[in-house]
């Protein structure tokens, strides 16, 4: 499945390079118009990241997200700075279909386990942003990639699988925003090891060949941000590479 994405800071569409707020590109685009265009080209899911909220949970862009959801028919998944059950409930009540949880899954796993039980497997997606070290270990970063988490991807899957983990978004941080291609080896490995989880691939997508490579890795979906914003290809072309999306 092709999942177009936009990242938002202070209501503006942006892209970061490798998660670095100091390396920000701002696009002169209306978030709603951009998402509506993706929807018109056939996207059935859209991914929104609240980067303001990821950096400062007190400044989450909830009102804007509500306006976007209200004016879109596609399913929306939202991440960025979600730290409490009240925030999860607020987003779901706005009509967001799936809430993406990152740092908290590392820092307070019991809390996130309870959300999987309360809201169901389809309402919660874990965002596992990994740095792969020289030993090949997949270390999950936290707090908008501003600090390392110290836990491995495998240990986190083991923590959440008994509670019904079904959706997980995995980004190789070294590829994010780089347009250097996706780490398909990473996705092949985790899909083979955990076939019951619907893995979303993210980071580095630049070409339609990259899209096809991720599809062939066995991932369930692919998050595409920058490549669409800079018109490397269209949503329609990406969907043509990934039938049954």
Swiss-Prot record:
One of its GO terms (cellular component) is cytoplasm. Transmembrane segments: none annotated. It is found in: Cytoplasm. It comes from the Bacteria. One of its GO terms (biological process) is L-histidine biosynthetic process. Pathway: Amino-acid biosynthesis; L-histidine biosynthesis; L-histidine from 5-phospho-alpha-D-ribose 1-diphosphate: step 4/9. It holds the Pfam family His_biosynth. One of its GO terms (molecular function) is 1-(5-phosphoribosyl)-5-[(5-phosphoribosylamino)methylideneamino]imidazole-4-carboxamide isomerase activity. Its main location: cytoplasm. CDD domains: HisA. Its EC number is 5.3.1.16. InterPro entries: Aldolase_TIM, His_biosynth, HisA_bact_arch, Isoase_HisA-like, Isoase_HisA-like_bact, RibuloseP-bd_barrel. It is an enzyme of class 5 (isomerase). It catalyses: 1-(5-phospho-beta-D-ribosyl)-5-[(5-phospho-beta-D-ribosylamino)methylideneamino]imidazole-4-carboxamide = 5-[(5-phospho-1-deoxy-D-ribulos-1-ylimino)methylamino]-1-(5-phospho-beta-D-ribosyl)imidazole-4-carboxamide. Keywords: Amino-acid biosynthesis, Cytoplasm, Histidine biosynthesis, Isomerase. The active site is at residues 7, 129. PANTHER family: 1-(5-PHOSPHORIBOSYL)-5-[(5-PHOSPHORIBOSYLAMINO)METHYLIDENEAMINO] IMIDAZOLE-4-CARBOXAMIDE ISOMERASE. Belongs to the HisA/HisF family. This is 1-(5-phosphoribosyl)-5-[(5-phosphoribosylamino)methylideneamino] imidazole-4-carboxamide isomerase.
